[in-house]
Each structure stands twice: as structure tokens, then as C-alpha cells.
A protein has these predicted regions:
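N-terminal targeting leaders
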Residues: 1-175
Length: 175
């Protein structure tokens, strides 16, 4: 429990927002499994009430339906629909994506200019999505680090950008 508390403190989201984000993720995942089953492979990532959808759907219509359904959920402020209408990815592709995510997170931890606990890394088909509450300078460092990881095809920013003053305020409030 102490470890979890430390992560909450380092996260720039307040504990209430973190809880809302987790609730959105769980609700969306449960809904998608029940409604679409094996017709989709959707990863739901939530940061600061903004939802990133990655993965595959069997048709373009399903891609649109999934995004619309999630957008209508309580507490969701934005949906970034990065789903593709394609055959569902296999274990090998998903394992490679998990490996890339781990490599990027490790590189972030090694750089004091990246607030790794205020960021989320999502990888799908070699494309990396970075979410979080960061300054423009932090975003640029994170993007450059992610781009340098072998196997990364593309890096997309899904950040909430804040000023240096907001960074100091948020970091101070969470100590």
C-alpha cells in the first residue's frame, strides 16, 4: 500500500481524478467485452478523463460504434480513436508492443527531465502514444526518448500541456 501511495503522490492528477480515470477504463473495457466480444481488440487508456482507444475492429462501422459508445460514457471528456479496421492482432504483435512500452518506461525512469509517474505509455503495432500532464519541454524530451527506442515506428502525443507555473503548483500540491 505504501508503494501505491507513493505513485499517487508523484502523479500530477489528484487522487479523485485518478479514481475517475480507473472507473472509466473499467466501465469501458467491461462494456466493450460484453457488447462486441471477439469482434474487437480494444485497449482503453485513460488519463485525466481523456480516453485513447487503440487496437483493431473487424469493420469501419465497429470502429465508429466503439468510439461513440465510449464518448457517451459518464465523465469522459475526450476520445482519441486510434482504432484500425483490420484483422485482430496476435500474441506476437501484442508481446512486442508490451516490450516496447517497457523499454520506453525504463528510459523515462532514467531521465530526470521526464515525469514518468505523470505519464502513460501505450504501444499498438509499434506506434507509441504518450499521455499525461506535462510541460512542453517535458513532452519534447519524452517524445525524443521514445523515438530512439529500436522498433518504434511512430510517436503520437496525447498530452495535456501545462505551464511551468502549473507544473510547480501541481508538483507542490502532491508532495
Amino acid at each position: 500500500m505504501l508503494f501505491r501511495s507513493a505513485l499517487v503522490i508523484a502523479d500530477r492528477r489528484n487522487p479523485g481524478t485518478q479514481s475517475i480515470d480507473r472507473g472509466i477504463q473499467l466501465e469501458a473495457e467491461s462494456f466493450l467485452i460484453k457488447k462486441y466480444g471477439d469482434n474487437v481488440h480494444v485497449n482503453v487508456s485513460v488519463f485525466n478523463r481523456r480516453v485513447l482507444l487503440t487496437g483493431e475492429t473487424r469493420t469501419e462501422q465497429l470502429k465508429s460504434e466503439v468510439a461513440s459508445s465510449v464518448k457517451a460514457m459518464k465523465n469522459v471528456s475526450d476520445v482519441f480513436n486510434e482504432l484500425v479496421a483490420a484483422p485482430l492482432s496476435g500474441l506476437s504483435a501484442r508481446t512486442n508492443d508490451a516490450y516496447l512500452t517497457t523499454r520506453i518506461k525504463g528510459a523515462f525512469l532514467a531521465d530526470k527531465n521526464v515525469p514518468s509517474n505523470s505519464m502513460k505509455v501505450v504501444t499498438e503495432a509499434g506506434k507509441v502514444y504518450l499521455m499525461g500532464i506535462v510541460t512542453e519541454a517535458e513532452a519534447n524530451v519524452a517524445v525524443n526518448i521514445a523515438r530512439e527506442v529500436p522498433g518504434v515506428k511512430q510517436v503520437t502525443k496525447v498530452f495535456d500541456l501545462i505551464s511551468e507555473a502549473d507544473k510547480r503548483r501541481l508538483d507542490g500540491a502532491n508532495k
